[in-house]
């Protein structure tokens, strides 16, 4: 294949632009349009005569998932072995961007070795609710922490010359109906909570691609949302890379191209090409729109293809396993350690109980699932830990069924040990792409086991595996609680390193753990019965809500214990940042995460009680003191003013609060900040509950005042965007039967305790996705025929489906021949 030689050898943007302009002039409209959609599930189209290679994209937020055979977007089919690193939710608890960059570098190295040009991650959606089934893939409830950690991953991945792909842009915080839901959110909340993390990534790490989300935002699909993609992403932030759709996430391909979306994935086939050509020919969009997107794509293709071609096809798997173990260890959070039960002394007699000890839960389910090169188990690593094992008992059924015999065996074993290491957690069904959690509870059989074991042996250490927070009413039944999250393939060894004191735990929570789900701010507006998702809580997500509204929590944001203690002193502050002294006052070395929160108690523009605006992680020997500096950036004091439509600063006195967690503030200083003298954006509006933070009482009128417009009507329409699960709303017996069959399959899989992810995806999939995810076998004309069928025009609908099917076959064949021979 002829290649543009200097684009492959010389990293000079100006030369590549000249070559790309030359290529663009040689391509006809059909060729251009064909390049803007995928060739297969994970590859782009190649044009040999023009010297345009194909590149491979692959899932990989916590490890590379390149599928060797039949490809799918849900992680159902096997993939090439790779290192499974701890998930983003886990590594976020390290609060260590340097560590994140190391992980990203290793993942990028493995991706390039497997000839992957674009690694689809990291994910940094804001954790609006603890029930989001994909929270294990996301960093935090706080956009600043999410942005800083995600930026570190992107820098690491792209240090190999390939592209990272931060996702899902934006306001995509639930799995239910994720391809059809409409996130109704006010502009200030959108900017401050749901876009700030992405802004940090774009400006600080310069990703080459970004993935748009499935959902609508205020009535417009994210992938064709001009305000999101052109005004903000490309305009305000200066992003000049490629925007890639989520798989099947394109609604109107032409509008996507016009409004800033570059590449439609996976492989919609010839119908997408014709759709784009017709849009140009009809004047709906211009050829200049197509050229702009193609220029972005060619830059990505030539840049990353060159990097992949020159990269080694091998990597040091042992070194990456060691990194995965270190990352997991630095991310483990010690939540309770009564009477300093940990660390365990060498030779301590321990009983290991819990199914997770023999079959670890170390990653989430769905498209992020990695085919791990190897997986350490707790039982195997125990042999090298220096502890004396008195035996193992599974203790409980993993899927939650009562088992008295297993529990009795575990209790008997517990009585023989000095300490019980009880491995509990959420099973694979509880947390998955495509599914939201139904509750925040640990399985009843695990709680009953804990109570029984604790009665037999009070020295019970709960080792918890879960990708998101849990309710902990059972906390009093254990002396120690250690949260390992989802620790990746080396997580078991990392946990034993912490339990035995080889590693002093330094992780701190990146999300609040509440006492009960009923305490969460979005409880009444998360994953409801309709398509519309009202973000009524506004700015008050996570600790921003709990601390403003005075809601007690189990474990606050930023919380985590250590085997040593730290003292804070000598705080000096101004509007540019703080310096202070931190001293290790304990008897062992350890790391402390110093957190900087900004507050304005006398604010005239309502805001949360305090917000994270900086942090630093430092390692100190016993008795060692060190000066810590934390700088404040341009986001420290700003708020989005909906009246001036820009970032503003309210002038006056601010508190800079430095602490070991959001609830453990050690030092406070006041600084004076010059304001921008902007008008009050909420003057004359009745926003009582937003001012107080008591947002669970927000009225319809208040929310509409915050939005600046009425809440749209939530209706199911019989059109291309009706989901397969909504076909019972139509007027077609065939649709009713199809919906009932899907519902039966779905319910049956749940009843068996093994939800079928493919059926879940299909049930929540809009009809248009049939034309976007079948490699050209289904056209949008066929979908329109199906819509006619569902509207009750049965014969006309069926005949149109048949006609469009034949037409699509002929047109696809003709187009492919033209593309091959041109």
Q: Where are these predicted regions, by residue range?
A:
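Glycoside hydrolase catalytic-domain context in secreted enzymes
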Residues: 2, 7-635, 639, 653-657, ...
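Enrichment for repetitive, rod-forming helical segments
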Residues: 10, 39, 174, 712, ...
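Generic surface-pattern signal
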Residues: 29, 41, 281, 299-302, ...
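Terminal connector regions
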Residues: 634-681
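Charged, amphipathic alpha-helical linkers/stalks
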Residues: 669-737
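C-terminal non-catalytic accessory extensions
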Residues: 754-822
